[in-house]
Structures are given as C-alpha cells and as structure tokens.
C-alpha cells in the first residue's frame, strides 16, 4: 500500500511542477489558464501515450498518429512560492495551494472560491490490490452530471457507479450498470454558489465512482474515484458555468463532428430484426411500413 500523508519540496521543472510526498511523486501542469493536470505517478515511468487528448503541452508516443487532430500548446504562466508548511502556485485565473502535513491539494479561482480540495489521507492512495484511489471534498447538496452512458437519474449524487464497458443489450434503463460508453468525466455543480467544475480522469482502465454514497465522519463529505490500473491522472476544468466547462473539455478531448441532416430525424435501431431466424430483411421493411401507417416520420433504420 501507498498513502500520501506528507508533502515535501515543490519544484518548478519548466513545463510542470514536481511535488514530492512520502509515497509518490505528483506533477502539476497549468495546461491553460482554466485547465489543470494533476498526475500521481504510481508507476514511475510517466509514459505519455494518449489516444484521448487533442490538446497537450508535452510529447506523446501517439503524436504522429494523432497528427492533424492534436494541438500542442505552451503551458500557461504561473509562479511558485514554496514554504515549509505549504506551497502556492499562482496562475492567471487559478491558484493551487499544496498543504504539506497532512498532505492535500486545493484549487481556487481568481475570486478566491474553492473549486477543488483533496481529502487528507484519502486523496492519493494505492491499496493492497494496486488499485489507485483519489478522494475529493464535496458538499451534501452537490449535483454530479456526466460519466458517459449511464442509466437512472441525470444527477448522480449519492450514487456508486462502475465503469466496465460491455454489451448490455436489454438493460434496465433505471438500474443497469455499466453500459457501453466509458467516459470518466463529470461535472460537479454546487447548488448554493451555482459554480461548476469539471473532472476528467485520463485513464481507460476499469474504474468506479462513489459520488458521496459512502460517508465517514472522520473526514469531510467526499467523492472518490478508484481505478484498477494506471495513474491517477486528473484534468481539473474550471467554469464557473457548465457551458464553459463543456467548451473547455471538448477543447481537451475533441469536438463532435457535424451531423448530417438525416441524423436530426428519427432513426430506428434494433438487433431484434437482424437476429430473426428468417425473413429479417422483410421484418425491417415491415417496421418502416408501420411507421408510415402510424404517421411517424422515420429518416432511417440501422
């Protein structure tokens, strides 16, 4: 097991900041004035081989493959002040405060509002099964949106969710977990301040999210992310609005392509007809005929 209890020296390494702890080195990038990257290097190799990122400030083994859709930027300017009890990295719009004992990282916006705070003793851990865990401070009435394709209510507060994509055909729209699309990104919205912040965990390994379902009175209320492999590699995206976070998240991972006009209409889709023992083509055509008889405009079927 590895647990980050205490922090040490914080160093300016040019394009990133290195944070020493008793357990593992962390690195912090100011990717832009509104996007931070916080990576805990449990594997120690700091390998960069992303297929997800369309904006980076570092070299990656996939740069040649992603040529034409990946933009290289210079890290945003920031100033480090390292002290005995804490370090401060001040950017144009974000400020990172690193408390050294107990160890935790906090992020503030330019108005001094707290956007993110780690939970001391829980934030950067590797358990006995080598799963890596990150815990973040939340409030009782926070809302959580995102996570890719999920069943149930849109707000995932007090939910526990697994991300292990598979063929979930015939799933229960209220309870089944997980479904097809694995996207470890979510937005936390504070009901009181109406401020939002985005969390993108840059990892394709199977993982799970506890969005305040677990409660321990030893610590402030928290959410947690646990991954079966890979580093804790968090991109923290400032808002304050949800619209701004989505814009910045898609700057980071890519924009959607422009859909054809037909995609704006009704598209029928079912595995039932193709898997019929016979006459599957006729069954598809019968479906189209039925939509016409019922006055349902159908633009396509797949």
What are these regions (language model features)?
Residues 1-271, 276-289, 300-301:
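N-terminal accessory segment at the very beginning of proteins
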Residues 295-297:
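Short loop/turn motifs at secondary-structure junctions
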Residues 292:
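Anion (oxyanion) recognition and catalysis
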